[in-house]
A protein has these predicted regions:
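Active-site neighborhoods and metal-handling regions in enzymes and metal-associated proteins
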Residues: 1-143
């Protein structure tokens, strides 16, 4: 929290030697996140904003992973997770300039591995501005 406001961020962390499928999971998650981020603009619905990221996931054979069942973004402000707007496949919420959201992509292979990329962003007329300052790739140890 900062002056009563909350933020939200997440990174997948690879620990140890990363096999090809785990690397693909990490790479695809980041690519989908970047595609989704580049599409965010004021005036679009949450469903429209959801499309770009999920095109990457579909192309790579991963299912739509709606973070905690709500979509690939949620509002953030006084609370880390507020009700609206939602960015997801069924959302008709409208993104508004200078609105703050947490934009996230989650990928899971149950029983094997999972990862997430998430930043707190401000919706700007020319594209989103990330307020998160943390590396996107985190490898603690590799042989």
């Amino acid at each position: 929290r900062y002056n009563g406001y909350s933020s939200d961020m997440a990174r997948g962390v690879a620990y140890g030697k990363v096999d090809a499928e785990k690397q693909r999971l990490l790479d695809t998650c980041l690519e989908a996140w970047r595609a989704g981020m580049s599409a965010l603009r004021p005036g679009m619905t949450g469903a429209e904003a959801d499309v770009a990221a999920n095109e990457v996931l579909k192309r790579e054979g991963y299912p739509h992973m709606a973070g905690e069942g709500r979509g690939c973004a949620h509002s953030t402000g006084m609370d880390p997770e507020e009700e609206i707007p939602v960015v997801g496949p069924d959302s008709q919420d409208i993104l508004v300039e200078n609105q703050t959201i947490a934009f996230e992509i989650t990928l899971l292979i149950p029983g094997y591995a999972g990862t997430r990329v998430e930043d707190t962003v401000v919706i700007r007329k020319d594209g989103p501005e990330s307020l998160t300052n943390h590396p996107y790739v985190c490898n603690w140890y590799q042989d």
